[in-house]
């Protein structure tokens, strides 16, 4: 395999950044769900040869191994202090892929005992000028039992 270091940075810079910086009418929640679906599929099929190569490339590009970044907090070891904030993967569908993006931890977060649909749509808004998003999701998730099932399927 050829050296692909920088490939994902180029994809992000040339494809993702223009979409995020300029509001071209793509619904923010749709874009988020689409991205999470791709990541979930990749996470669940990471042993497929093509997906395995892509994930390996992600890992090589984004993961920094440096013992100076290691953290031990409350007896828990973290390879680095950079984490994925709560709310993106509320149901733990892609929980075993976050480390391949270089995260030292991921906070699943926003999980309730029972499933709930959250606030009515629209509830996620892109603020292109501010390069930000406004989140009024309202704790939509499939519930704690579903999260436990998802995490146990991927041995987390």
What are these regions (language model features)?
Residues 6-71, 135, 140, 144:
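An N-cap/entry alpha-helix motif that binds or orients negatively charged groups
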Residues 63-82, 127:
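N-terminal small/glycine-rich loop or linker at the start of catalytic domains
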Residues 78, 94-111:
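Active-site cofactor/substrate anionic-group-binding motifs, chiefly glycine-
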Residues 80-90:
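Active-site mouth loops of central-metabolism enzymes
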Residues 92, 96, 100, 144-152:
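Amphipathic, non-transmembrane alpha-helical secondary structure
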Residues 154-156:
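Conserved small/polar residues in nucleotide/adenosyl-binding loops
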